From Swiss-Prot:
One of its GO terms (cellular component) is plasma membrane. This is ATP synthase subunit alpha. It comes from Rubrobacter xylanophilus (strain DSM 9941 / JCM 11954 / NBRC 16129 / PRD-1). Residues 505-526 are annotated as: Disordered. PROSITE patterns: ATPASE_ALPHA_BETA (PS00152).
């Protein structure tokens, strides 16, 4: 190898200096001033963003995620989304530059994850297409369209009288142990042929209750299109706070792809309690019932993200079914009234009805769907149009009838009809019904074709009628299913079919009557 001349060395050095790029990696690092109860006060992160994820290095050398929520002049209040036992005064905290986000896509379906999107089902890492921020601004008015497509729950009482549309927010509210979680799980099971992706968010529930819900979803094949997010009572309040937003972000991914998604928040009462705990520890001023001043905004910004997108923006939808637990049936308390005012209607479950074996225990008088009727199929609207009024009249007359026995014939007929309609709306748990069968069954009830059937025999009548129509009149059911209408000709054919069935109907009196919805319920403690 020849020697380099001095001028060559000089030119090589000049070239190296010219091509040199300085790469300086800067990190903003802070120190923990105090820590306790899942909250840390941190000094030194002067440029941290609101809701930015930060990384603690604990005494074991492990990394723990936190979320910056209080941005004060000389320190930052951080909620710790993990084990804070080994985070000590003086521990190092680093900015990540990322807002809280979760993995989304087909890879999360069939999985059980925590509020940070980490798998907790022991089935390995999640193969996600991308991540989405858990907090995002809801779509504006221009990007939305009217709710015009039904979300079939498979529950007769809901699909007929309190219909839910895709993109709607319908509150399920009631005392503990009244069947709230059962309604939600049945709705998920009914989506098996509806092409709706489901997200079930459990906040503050027992792990055993959530495991029970997952087992039921697996048994009915519903986990294939469902993601379960578990932020149980044993997990830190920050994870319970984040869980609904994480579930919403996963649902939004499908909505923005033009698909339909359903997200269930079980329940937002415990979500509000977790938020109150965090805010009190961060020393934010308490208001009514010690909740912070922005408790309404906590839920409104979550539920406003449910939408039916216009065709120009993909035409997808995100339907929200939040659950609220009341105390002694008091729906006028702070959190229940907040969420009632945010949502597009509510399904109120009554403990007295539940104990009287009317299950699902829906109080028709207090339940309403403000936008769902425009999404209801025409066939259901036609057969169930007077159902709510008939039941209201029956309940009113029944309360007066107990005081006297001298009732005129018209009153007796109204009571008898109401008794049969009430029995007709009972439904077993985990037995969602296709909408065409619902139309046929309710048609029989509202058209007086149950007159000769004893109220106790109505469940047998319904089960046998469904079997009879499936075996002998499949064309009739197919006609209702595909056209979604009940023309005069179809109605006449249906009437004739039910009348023929009634002639040979024999109640199976030896069988045990409908033990409807015996509820091990609620992923909540009830």
């Amino acid at each position: 190898m020849g020697r380099l001349r001095p001028e060559e060395i000089s030119s090589i050095l000049k070239g190296a200096i010219t091509d040199y790029e300085s790469r300086v990696r800067t990190e903003e690092v802070g120190q923990v001033l105090e820590v306790g109860d899942g909250i840390a006060r941190v000094h030194g992160l002067s440029n941290v963003m609101y809701q930015e994820m930060v990384e603690f290095e604990d005494a074991r050398g492990e990394k723990v995620i936190g979320l910056a929520l209080n941005l004060e002049e000389d320190n930052v209040g951080v909620i710790i989304a993990g084990d804070d036992r080994y985070i000590l005064e003086g521990s190092t905290v680093r900015r990540t530059g990322r807002l809280a986000s979760v993995p989304v896509g087909q890879g999360v379906l069939g999985r059980v994850i925590n509020a940070l999107g980490q798998p907790i089902d022991g089935r390995g890492e999640i193969q996600a297409e991308e991540t989405r921020p858990v907090e995002i601004i809801a779509p504006g008015i221009i990007r939305r369209k009217d709710v015009d497509t039904p979300l079939q729950t498979g529950i007769k009482a809901i699909d007929s009288m309190i219909p839910i549309g895709r993109g709607q927010r319908e509150l399920i509210i009631g005392d503990r142990k009244t069947g709230k979680t059962a309604l939600a799980v049945d709705t998920i099971i009914n989506q098996h042929d509806q092409n709706v992706k489901c997200i079930y968010v459990a906040v503050g529930q027992k792990d055993s209750a959530v495991a029970g819900v997952v087992a039921q979803l697996e048994e009915y094949g519903a986990m294939e299109y469902t993601t379960v997010i578990n932020a149980s009572a044993s997990q830190p309040a920050p994870l319970q706070y984040l869980a609904p937003y994480a579930g919403c972000a996963i649902g939004e991914y499908f909505m923005h792809r033009g698909e339909d998604a359903l997200v269930i928040y079980d329940d937002l009462s415990k979500h509000a309690v977790a938020y109150r705990q965090m805010m009190l520890l961060l020393r934010r001023p308490p208001g009514r019932e010690a909740y912070p001043g922005d408790i309404f905004y906590l839920h409104s910004r979550l539920l406003e993200r449910a939408a039916r997108m216009s065709e120009e923006y993909g035409g997808g939808s995100l339907t929200a079914l939040p659950i609220i637990e009341t105390k002694a049936g008091d729906i006028s308390a702070y959190i229940p009234t907040n969420v009632i005012s945010i949502t597009d209607g509510q399904i109120f479950l009554d403990l007295d009805l539940f104990n009287a074996n009317q299950r699902p225990a829906i109080d028709v008088g207090l339940s309403v769907s403000r936008v769902g009727s425009s999404a209801q199929i025409k066939a259901m609207k036609k057969v169930a149009g007077t159902l709510k009024l008939d039941l209201s009249q029956y309940r009113e007359l029944a309360s007066f009838a107990q005081f006297g026995s001298d009732l005129d014939k018209a009153t007796q007929e109204t009571l008898a009809r109401g008794e049969r309609l009430t029995a007709l709306l009972k439904q077993r748990e985990r037995d969602p019904m296709p909408v065409e069968e619902q139309v046929a069954v309710i048609f029989g009830g509202t058209q007086g074709l149950l007159r000769e059937v004893e109220p106790d025999d109505v469940p047998d009548w319904e089960a046998q009628l469904r079997e009879y129509l499936r075996s002998s009149h499949e064309d009739l059911l197919k006609d209702i299913r595909e056209k979604k209408e009940l023309t005069d000709e179809t109605a006449e054919r249906l009437r004739e079919a039910i009348e023929r069935f009634n002639e040979g109907f024999e109640p199976a009196r030896s069988e045990v009557k409908v033990e409807t919805r015996p509820q091990e319920e609620e992923g909540e403690e009830g």
